[in-house]
Amino acid sequence: MNSNELDLRNKYFYEIFGKKRKSDTSTPTQLFSGSKVQTNINEISITNDEDEDSTEDENKASLKDYTLGHDTGARYRIAPDCSSHQLKASPVLHISTNLNSSPQSFTGDQISPTNKKISINDSTRQDKGNSCTTTSSPSQKRSNVLLPHVRKHSSPSLLSFSKNSGSHMGDPNQLSTPPTPKSAGHTMELHSSFNGKHSSSSTSSLFALESLKTQNRRSSNSSNHSSQYRRHTNQHQRHHSRSKSSPVSLTEISMIKGTPLVYPALLSLIAIKFKQTIKLSTHKKMGLLYRDSFTGKQAIDTLCLIIGSLDRNLGMLIGKSLEAQKLFHDVLYDHGVRDSVLEIYELSSESIFMAHQSQSSTSIANTFSSSSSSVNSLRTKTEIYGVFVPLTHCYSSTCSLEKLCYSISCPNRLQQQANLHLKLGGGLKRNISLALDKEDDERISWTNSVPKSVWESLSKQQIKRQEAIYELFTTEKKFVKSLEIIRDTFMKKLLETNIIPSDVRINFVKHVFAHINEIYSVNREFLKALAQRQSLSPICPGIADIFLQYLPFFDPFLSYIASRPYAKYLIETQRSVNPNFARFDDEVSNSSLRHGIDSFLSQGVSRPGRYSLLVREIIHFSDPVTDKDDLQMLMKVQDLLKDLMKRIDRASGAAQDRYDVKVLKQKILFKNEYVNLGLNNEKRKIKHEGLLSRKDVNKTDASFSGDIQFYLLDNMLLFLKSKAVNKWHQHTVFQRPIPLPLLFICPAEDMPPIKRYVTENPNCSAGVLLPQYQTSNPKNAIVFAYYGTKQQYQVTLYAPQPAGLQTLIEKVKQEQKRLLDETKHITFKQMVGQFFHSYINTNRVNDVLICHAGKILLVATNMGLFVLNYATSINQKPVHLLHKISISQISVLEEYKVMILLIDKKLYGCPLDVIDDAENADFLFRKNSKVLFKYVAMFKDGFCNGKRIIMIAHHFLHAVQLLIVNPLIFDFNSGNFKKNLKAGLVDFSVDSEPLSFSFLENKICIGCKKNIKILNVPEVCDKNGFKMRELLNLHDNKVLANMYKETFKVVSMFPIKNSTFACFPELCFFLNKQGKREETKGCFHWEGEPEQFACSYPYIVAINSNFIEIRHIENGELVRCVLGNKIRMLKSYAKKILYCYEDPQGFEIIELLNF
């Protein structure tokens, strides 16, 4: 085998994985000096730097130019007239890309200015000599060897692009890559030996070649070839084997074995896998945040992973092919793909949805993991076509490395010629006419626009200042020209033709080109002012005053940038459903304009950021003395631009959030009960999203990510399941959405007992629980629990990676903490500790009351009345005041100094001063109290229309009595007591059992089991003036009609401004004065089954047995849930609620909830 020819092919078409054996001699390594990179991807050539002392002989191996690419495929040119002597010398690789006249290396290696050459023959002879004395063991030979899977074949044509691929070529800078790992296809150092020393020997190259030959075989005819493949495979597996406790991720497997994720020659497959694998996140460029974007380095990393190669330049070539077919683009449409963390790119809008589906769980999956199962549920249609020839297999079924293939375009041809010791030759000549047109609008600098005599006398700093000012002028001129193109080319043509259907044409133009005319009006005048200043003198004194004049009129940029997400959505929607529009956009892109609609519209997004950068440049090169006045104004301009950019960030961020929520709203389908997610709220945001699996991921395919897509909103957690129906993907709700205040999660397969946690931590909130017994989580399981509702459930899901699982947990913690911080003004205060026990002494708390300006607390229990005086001492125990059995309710009329108690279905009235004498309280109560009413089920006192009224409900005949309070009633020792009591009494009858009384401004609502009655209270106390009617109109609304199918358990009414807020066990809503539901304010459903209600504006509170539900009364948002065990509300005030709960020992703790 001709080792020189073989080494030439190795260096260009193969990557050499691993290091040389210890048997190889260690000689200093010299870099190939002939690497030349120019910037046109259509012309790639391999040439040999001729040695000055070399002479031509008769046996020269002429390497003809050849081109076999389709359309604008890249070409490899081997320099002609290469003698055999020159071939024996180390050939130097030249890569010519003709995008720029200045040479530039693909890698970051330092190239010697002199063309140093390495004689591979000499180094090989040295290795052979040294290998006789030093022999390495098999383990040493295998150490650190990475066997490649992707073959770097020699091919007449590097790329076979689809149409129009040649019009999207990049900047030369985009081809620069880090110096390591070295790419064998381009400038490459010889690999170091195992002992860390450098060597120029080709032994490691031959070893890697043998690995490539075994893995890239095309025929199974050779048993020797198969045995080599098995030998190297076994060695590789032994070397890279790992324990089960340390699983290898998909990324590690691909990069170690060089295993491509798809067939790397088909660009369509690479495009689909790229969409599924690329990690989308938020990046910032020129002061603006770009969501769902990625860096150039991430793109090349992902492409190298997909094709299973460490050659970043190879990834660059594939990236250019994909970018040329509009798979992704620079966010500013300024240049092509570059291998840099500073350059930001985004997928085409039609690809974003698929990318979200497959890798929106980047927090769940590894950075480059993809879901094989989700591919079945995702659309695999792609508009990317083409074949990457160097990575293709030969189409001949009989092709092998042992004989020369009959096909001249066989990718294995060069290696076959090397194996058979054939001379290089043949091929097609390069077609110069296929070279790209280099017509580029070169930017004219300020020094070229003015005579040399003008700037010769200026300092270097002043020249740079004038250059910055002139750049501001030229870029503004270009921007205004783009606006004119938008107005005259796009808007006018779309309005005057039938490209867009007539029914949506006006709306499309209105939203896509929103605020373009306002921006054009302002910037045209701004440009005129700049042009006038430039024309006054070749040396511009300054432009700060012009900026200060026009900056207040730059507000249309805010509205324009905020409208971009929706405009982009409309454009991509029309492209997908309207072939006429897609054709029009493609024609514009391929015309002299060279950009599509979206590219032109994006210039308005980046323009404010460019202003900030240019002004900063001008300030940097301004002289503090000579440019003092202009510099001071420029500092003001910079502050104003910073403020503008902050406002733009807020506006664009809010618009993007709103757009994301709208897209989510459109694709949600509720299979069973509809749940209001609050997506119509303008402040709703998607905080996190990803994929989880219903199955153990470790038992499935290594690339499996999940089949359940979750969305963490700022108010709840949503689970969706994708299903294909008639080529459309429906996203049905997998489980009922869980509000964050009721969401418990645990990183394990089993949830610890939540009830025990709530009982031991009273007044707690939902959150993350630690596993009870499990110390590790090898399956990456996570349990979600919906707590305390009629729809409560638990579901266990699995995450592909522990890092993603931890990210989800942290995001949930952040959102739940944010909700608590927003309601930190809601506080708790313990009024009575462990004193009342309902099981041991049957001393159940029935009612409480605060009187004497909050100094006295009265507690009514089954064993009597207790009093707690906070003014005398702290932490004292309640005093048993009255020894009466079963005191149900208590109320105090402080203006009359009377206490009213409901004891064993009898309503008593007694003087309030009995609470001051605890020792004689029983005697005073028997002596001075009077029975007001008998057979009383409940009572309530309050004010209505300026009168103090007591409402009494009886057990028999659904009777209701109204007592108008006056001082004569409570003269218990008077002989006219009963007469005075009867004088203020009004009797009513309702058709069902009364449940509650609600005092409104001049009405009293009586909530009954079957309906709601409203009682008008006249200003003048006339028994005939009290009128009762039914409040709700059954036939007015379907919601109300459905409510009457069942009897009510509890009903409460609260006056809110000019409306009435009605609360029922299922839902709540606003009523107007006519008793009709206010449709504009919505209808809110409770999470639980409330037993009591309270109102503390702007909050409405529903009391359940195991949690307190606090909602915003205007929009129904669930702001907080207070968890507990056996919760009961005792009394409610305007800004306070007294309630009790049961602690782990069974004591009833009385708490005060302050708003």
UniProtKB/Swiss-Prot annotation:
GO CC annotation terms, alphabetical: cell division site; cell periphery; cytoplasm
Disulfide-bonded cysteines: none
Sites bearing Phosphothreonine, chain numbering: T180
Ranges of Polar residues composition bias in the record: 100-143
Biased composition, class Low complexity, residue ranges: 155-167, 190-227
Record-listed Phosphoserine modification sites: S154, S155, S433
PROSITE patterns recorded: CNH (PS50219), DH_2 (PS50010)
Gene3D superfamilies noted in UniProt: Dbl homology (DH) domain (1.20.900.10), Pleckstrin-homology domain (PH domain)/Phosphotyrosine-binding domain (PTB) (2.30.29.30), Winged helix-like DNA-binding domain superfamily/Winged helix DNA-binding domain (1.10.10.10)
UniProt entry keywords in alphabetical sequence: Acetylation, Guanine-nucleotide releasing factor, Phosphoprotein
Function in brief: Stimulates the exchange of RHO1 GDP-bound form into GTP-bound form.
Protein known as: RHO1 GDP-GTP exchange protein 1
Organism: Saccharomyces cerevisiae (strain ATCC 204508 / S288c) (Baker's yeast)
Gene: ROM1
